[in-house]
């Protein structure tokens, strides 16, 4: 039986093309201004924490690539009902995560890195389950890289520390998350 499909080939080409274009410079073409500001601030905080411009760029690039590929899958109607339900659970979990992150920033002495790390890893698992067979092993590796960094307790502790420049990065990230929550875009 011949399994060739033009539709499948076109979808693969579209994902490949978009993944090649996904960089910080063109991210604004695929995401709104607020999301772009949050990603820029995440880039700066990561660059400060890792002391590596290359690592910070890789993190944001991987995040954008996965988001773009997921958007392509959604637009092409490639996800089944169960996968869409998992994505809905992921969206709800991401909203709770954003509200928790903002709350930890706004209320002194409430920060608990384990809560954020656990929730981030739950989001990672939901994303793996939802995207499943539609993404390559390399894309799943990108998901692991992004969430592994974000859930790193040392990174979270640095980000929520009262020291500069992390305090400024966190304030701008939380300002963006608050706008995204208000606009219901997360």
From Swiss-Prot:
Asked whether the UniProt record includes Cytoplasm among its keywords, one would answer yes
| Compartments, record wording | Cytoplasm
Q: What is its main location?
A: cytoplasm
Judging by the UniProt lineage, the source's domain of life is Eukaryota
Q: Gene3D superfamilies under this entry?
A: Tumor necrosis factor alpha-induced protein 8-like (1.20.1440.160)
UniProt keyword Metal-binding, yes or no: no
Give UniProt keywords alphabetically: Cytoplasm
Which GO CC annotations does the UniProt entry carry?
A: cytoplasm
Example GO biological process: regulation of apoptotic process
Q: Which family is annotated?
A: Belongs to the TNFAIP8 family.
What function is annotated for this protein?
Answer: Acts as a negative regulator of mTOR activity.
Q: Which PANTHER family match?
A: TUMOR NECROSIS FACTOR ALPHA-INDUCED PROTEIN 8-LIKE PROTEIN 1 (PTHR12757:SF2), TUMOR NECROSIS FACTOR INDUCED PROTEIN (PTHR12757)
The name of this protein is Tumor necrosis factor alpha-induced protein 8-like protein 1
Q: Which organism is it from?
A: Bos taurus (Bovine)
Lineage of the organism: Eukaryota, Metazoa, Chordata, Craniata, Vertebrata
